[in-house]
């Protein structure tokens, strides 16, 4: 056999091997609620809402959401066989914003740090955009994820919100922590002018360990809505209640979400949580 023929045969074997690996990977690609999960990309899923979560969401006269929807963004290299932290995004109720809408704001900084981003919603609108409505749909979204990836129940979870969403993030985090259904590893609260997290700790009593959860307050130096003074008061309130890891960071800007602050906060959560 000539050297040329031998090279062709070896090269051909390498090509066949590469093709086989590609086909093998394609056959084992992760899916969620019928959607293919591509690392570094985002998907939108639909999922059934169980009676349990419908009962929660429909309080205060809201309709019963039978189907939920969620936007998820995944970091490069994502593989559900490994553990990944999840950033749960909660939006304000102003301007008819939904958490699924706000998820895109956090996508770039969060996925760059190796986090999954989750924003949940329904396929119908509520009569009142209540905390119970948000809780029911978030719970149903987590249930849908855990149905296909049971191991995700043990993944660390942080809550993030801007303005009104930051207040509600604290409430939802305390409620879910009280139920023992999530492993809370941090709160990123931006543009916040009232301490709902501390109040929720006292109301829902998730346990003393909750006071060890790191809290990052992100304040715009020229914010006319959630002023620097308001952020200082929120920090003081949290520390007075007993939160031990409260960090207030200020940036040049107004009432806005600063992407670089999101990234720094997620790095801090990882450092303290050692995950």
Indicate where each model-derived feature is located.
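Bacterial N-terminal signal peptides
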Residues: 12-23
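A domain-start/cap signature at the N-terminus of enzymes
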Residues: 27-84, 176, 233-236, 246, ...
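Gly/Ser-rich "nucleophile elbow"/oxyanion-hole loop immediately N-terminal to the catalytic nucleophile
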Residues: 76-83, 129-164, 177-178
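Active-site machinery of serine-nucleophile hydrolases
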Residues: 86, 92-140
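Cell-envelope and extracellular/periplasmic
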Residues: 90-94, 146, 162, 169, ...
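Primarily recognizes the serine-hydrolase "nucleophile elbow" in alpha/beta-hydrolase
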Residues: 155-209
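The feature captures the conserved acid-bearing segment of alpha/beta-hydrolase catalytic domains
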Residues: 186, 191-262
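Catalytic active-site module of serine/aspartate enzymes centered on a nucleophile-bearing elbow/loop
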Residues: 262-275
């Amino acid at each position: 056999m000539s050297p040329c023929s031998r090279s062709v045969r070896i090269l051909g074997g390498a090509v066949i091997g590469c093709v086989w690996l590609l086909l093998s990977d394609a056959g084992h690609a992760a899916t969620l609620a019928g959607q293919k999960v591509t690392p570094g990309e985002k998907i939108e899923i639909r999922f059934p809402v169980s009676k349990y979560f419908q009962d929660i969401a429909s309080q205060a006269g809201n309709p019963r959401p039978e189907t939920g929807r969620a936007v998820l963004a995944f970091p490069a290299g994502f593989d559900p066989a490994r553990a990944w932290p999840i950033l749960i995004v909660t939006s304000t109720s102003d301007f008819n914003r939904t958490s699924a809408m706000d998820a895109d704001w956090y996508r770039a900084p969060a996925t760059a740090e190796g986090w999954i981003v989750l924003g949940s919603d329904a396929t119908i609108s509520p009569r009142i955009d209540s905390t119970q409505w948000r809780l029911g749909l978030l719970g149903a979204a987590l249930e849908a994820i855990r149905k296909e990836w049971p191991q995700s129940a043990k993944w660390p979870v942080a809550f993030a919100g801007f303005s009104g969403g930051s207040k509600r993030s604290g409430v939802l985090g305390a409620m879910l922590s009280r139920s023992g259904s999530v492993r809370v590893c941090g709160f990123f609260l931006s543009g916040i002018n009232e301490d709902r997290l501390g109040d929720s700790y006292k109301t829902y009593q998730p346990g003393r360990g909750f006071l060890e959860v790191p809290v990052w307050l992100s304040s715009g130096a020229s914010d006319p809505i959630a002023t620097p003074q308001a952020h200082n008061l929120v920090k003081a309130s949290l520390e007075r209640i007993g939160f031990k890891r409260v960090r207030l960071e200020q940036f040049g800007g107004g009432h806005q979400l600063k992407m670089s602050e999101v990234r720094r906060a997620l790095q801090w959560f990882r450092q303290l949580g050692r995950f």
